[in-house]
């Protein structure tokens, strides 16, 4: 994979994948965000560099550089400003655009935008260099819209490539777009009306003036307001649901009536605990809390700006306070969200000085009212959290912002327990007490959690999931011994041979794990013979020796918790098993195998964050019903830390009832990993070369594949565990069998198919093999049907990447998976 190097200054350069010897790549695309002179009041440049595009997307991009500052200039310029925006307003006037900026508002063609977070972007219609103006009512809206525009422009450049960045397109598409504006995006203006609601359209000339073309307009807010007006109420004493007429018809109405009763009862139980028996919260809230039931997470994100089981409203004029996507297992999350609304209505967060200075305490207060957390009372999680050494520190719990290494799954019950520990019977009294705590006092309380009763674990859940008539993979591999080692590790759960596909998430709202397009992709995979998928969350590490890990998943375009849970549930609904497989994404052009700390202090810090990351997802894997769990992926430089791995495996076993594996790197982890006997499956990302000869024929590839299979069989027998190919793949490039872990170069579907046919022909289905997960497909490939067909076909046919659907390799994979 091509690496990217983040500079410390205002520019970040990402090199394109290396080509052949002496090959000179194309000039990098330079995207420039020009901020006003004296930007200190708004901090626009700093906010752009703290944004999602700069921090999360740019390191993945191919051939893109971003410049930010008052003198920034590039292939495309974005002039960024905040009302009254003298710089941008002057440019708009000189271009004759229907844009007017006042002290507190931005007007476009007579429409006034003055709400916090709203912003307008317009393209200047003249000049040889494409220039956009982005003006916000406030800095937050301006930066958010500029960030959105950067994603659009980078995608137009074809920079996302295999990263699944967005709407497609490639450099050839851009170059073919002749004329003075090769960066035409299909719209000339874009308005951020709400976090996910946009207005877009094009200019036209009328009587010598530039005006909005009504035929080209798309106005999300107007459409949403029209749809929201059609929603019907299901009234209750304390909670009123809003749902579409179709959803309230037939059996859907009975389901929603049960939901309304549950939520109404939850509010009735929680309200008296806010301020006490004489408080106004004992009376029926006036008006009731209005909750909109969304059809899916994509619609929820468009209406609120984020996704989750239940999230607050964000659009101007919203009738609802909360928007939820219904699943019967998520009632606990709806109760927590309702508790948050009760706290806000009572003014307790503000009165306690809590929001926004202590977000973890705000979450904890809501959970203290709601009670349950991922299937059990929140207090029952505390012994496991303490024993697994994943508790936050006092400083982290009292921090004024949510750190990216923090885990909502793991830390919210701790915050609720801290609230509960305070004197008083009401939330108001407890918040008054917790407000006075210091980090040292919280640390002292946290130290006492280790003395609590042992965690109950998942023994009952494991027994409930077992299928006594099935033959376990471990028994198939070892001739009947389905136990682990002599220390009594858990046996492998009963699973058949896994015909798997590594299903990476496309980083887009419409194509993510949470999106309806996922169902179409799962259908397609099942049709080709797959019966399992792996799902992959990510943590980010800035470099191989950086001790901090940052949990990703902060927005709908990334691998969110709710998206992963939804994907597991949908896979099960389609009859597919799931391998839940956390990855670490390492910056600085590196890869997970390079991760190694410089000293013991850094190792302790890294392991603390890694435990938090893995156990966060182990809880989600259990809750969603995943079938297998991987404790790591290709972390070769950490394998010498055997004790830390042993402790992590033990902690995972207490919450996850299914088989455990580790996705070892093909180049040495099979032999070096010290913990195979503690796991149920030996796992390997199997990118073994089949031949060093670029011109190898079928016979030579078959011999190379036989040698690979012999090595795999030896590893399985040496560790007395079945072996799972956690990844196996070949890119669609010339001579892919010489270095299967690489992509890029000269495209060749034929060589990709030949390599798969050789390996699978030698592999067969021996009893020691638990299955394979082919690398890779994307969750949103079905959503690509909405993209321009010609560009999509060109990209699929010519990209030398690992995708196999729709290529010759699909037939080779389907043939292997059809064998029984």
Language-model regions: role of each:
Residues 9-226:
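Solvent-exposed alpha-helical segments and adjacent loops
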Residues 78, 235-357, 376:
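Juxtacatalytic substrate-recognition/specificity segment
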Residues 306, 310-319, 333-334, 352-465:
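Acidic/His/Gly-enriched intrinsically disordered linker/tail segments
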Residues 464-465, 470, 490-495, 513, ...:
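Aromatic-rich peripheral "rim/lid" segments of glycoside hydrolase catalytic domains that contact
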Residues 496-499, 504, 528-547, 561-638, ...:
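Substrate-binding cleft and catalytic face of glycoside hydrolase catalytic domains
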Residues 510-511, 539-560, 586-606, 696, ...:
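Surface-exposed, active-site-proximal loop segments in enzymatic domains
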Residues 511-525, 607-620, 666-675, 756-762:
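Short, acidic/polar
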Residues 560-561, 566, 573-574, 581, ...:
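Glycoside hydrolase catalytic-domain groove-lining segments
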């Amino acid at each position: 994979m091509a690496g990217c190097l983040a500079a410390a200054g205002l520019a970040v350069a990402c090199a394109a994948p290396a080509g052949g010897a002496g090959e000179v790549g194309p000039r990098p695309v330079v995207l420039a965000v020009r901020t006003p002179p004296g930007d200190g009041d708004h901090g626009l440049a700093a906010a752009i560099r703290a944004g999602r595009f700069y921090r999360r997307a740019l390191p993945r991009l191919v051939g893109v550089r971003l410049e930010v500052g008052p003198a920034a200039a590039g292939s495309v310029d974005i002039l960024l400003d905040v009302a009254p925006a003298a710089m941008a307003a002057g440019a708009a006037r000189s271009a004759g655009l229907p844009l007017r900026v006042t002290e507190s508002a931005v007007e476009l063609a007579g429409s006034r935008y003055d709400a916090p977070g709203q912003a307008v972007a317009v393209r200047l219609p003249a000049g040889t260099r494409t220039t956009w103006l982005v003006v916000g009512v406030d800095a937050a809206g301006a930066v958010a819209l500029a960030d959105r525009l950067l994603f659009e422009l980078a995608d137009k450049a074809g920079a996302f490539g295999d990263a699944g960045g967005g709407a497609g397109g490639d450099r050839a598409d851009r170059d073919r777009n002749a004329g003075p504006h090769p960066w035409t995006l299909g719209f000339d203006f874009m308005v951020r009306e709400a976090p996910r609601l946009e207005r877009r359209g094009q200019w036209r000339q009328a009587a010598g003036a530039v005006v909005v073309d009504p035929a080209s307009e798309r106005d999300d807010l107007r459409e949403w307001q029209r749809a929201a007006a059609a929603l019907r109420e299901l009234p209750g004493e304390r909670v009123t649901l809003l749902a579409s007429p179709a959803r309230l018809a037939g059996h859907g109405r009975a389901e929603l009536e049960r939901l309304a009763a549950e939520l109404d009862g939850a509010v009735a139980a929680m309200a008296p605990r806010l301020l006490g028996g004489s408080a106004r919260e004992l009376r029926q809230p006036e008006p009731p809390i209005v909750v909109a039931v969304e059809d899916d997470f994509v619609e929820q994100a468009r209406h609120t700006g984020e996704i989750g089981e239940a999230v607050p409203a964000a659009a101007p004029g919203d009738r609802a306070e909360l928007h939820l996507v219904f699943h019967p297992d998520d009632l606990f999350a709806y109760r927590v969200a309702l508790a948050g609304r009760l706290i806000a209505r009572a003014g307790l967060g503000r009165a306690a000085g809590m929001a926004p200075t202590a977000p973890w305490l705000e979450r904890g207060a809501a959970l203290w009212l709601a009670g349950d957390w991922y299937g059990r009372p929140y207090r029952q999680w505390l012994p496991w959290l303490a024993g697994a050494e994943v508790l936050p520190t006092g400083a982290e719990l009292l921090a004024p912002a949510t750190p990216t290494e923090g885990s909502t799954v793991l830390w919210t019950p701790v915050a609720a327990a801290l609230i509960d520990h305070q004197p008083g019977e009401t939330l108001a009294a407890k918040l008054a007490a917790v407000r006075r705590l210091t980090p040292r006092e919280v640390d002292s309380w946290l130290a006492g959690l280790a003395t609590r009763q042992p965690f109950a674990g998942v023994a009952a859940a494991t027994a409930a999931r077992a299928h006594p008539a099935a033959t376990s993979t471990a028994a198939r591999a070892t001739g009947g011994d389905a136990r682990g080692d002599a220390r009594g590790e858990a046996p492998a759960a009963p699973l058949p041979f896994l015909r798997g596909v590594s299903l990476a998430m496309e980083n887009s709202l419409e194509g993510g794990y949470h999106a309806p397009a996922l169902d179409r992709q799962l259908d397609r995979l099942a049709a080709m013979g797959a019966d399992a998928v792996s799902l992959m969350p990510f943590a980010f590490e800035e470099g191989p020796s950086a001790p901090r890990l940052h949990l990703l998943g902060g927005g709908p375009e990334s691998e969110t918790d709710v998206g992963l849970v939804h994907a597991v549930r949908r896979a099960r609904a389609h009859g597919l098993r799931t391998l839940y497989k956390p990855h670490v994404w390492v910056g600085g052009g590196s890869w997970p195998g390079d991760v190694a700390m410089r000293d013991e202090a850094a190792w302790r810090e890294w392991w603390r964050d890694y435990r938090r990351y893995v156990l966060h997802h182990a809880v989600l894997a259990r809750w969603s019903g995943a079938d297998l769990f991987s404790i790591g992926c290709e972390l070769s430089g950490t394998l010498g830390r055997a004790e830390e791995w042993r402790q992590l495996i033990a902690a995972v076993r207490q919450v996850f009832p299914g088989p455990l594996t580790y996705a070892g790197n093909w180049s040495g982890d099979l032999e070096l990993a010290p913990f195979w006997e503690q796991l149920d499956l030996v796992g390997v990302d199997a990118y073994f070369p089949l031949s060093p000869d670029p011109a190898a024929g079928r016979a030579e590839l078959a011999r190379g594949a036989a040698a690979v299979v012999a090595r795999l069989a030896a590893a399985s027998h040496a560790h007395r565990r079945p072996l799972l190919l956690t990844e196996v793949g070949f890119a669609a490039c010339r001579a892919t069998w010489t270095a299967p872990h690489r992509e890029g170069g000269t495209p060749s579907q034929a060589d990709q198919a030949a390599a798969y046919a050789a390996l699978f022909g030698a592999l067969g289905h021996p009893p020691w093999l638990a299955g394979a997960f082919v690398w890779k497909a994307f969750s949103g490939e079905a959503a690509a049907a909405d993209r321009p067909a010609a560009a999509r076909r060109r990209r699929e046919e010519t990209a030398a990447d690992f995708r196999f659907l729709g290529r010759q390799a699909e037939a080779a994979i389907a043939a292997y998976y059809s064998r029984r």
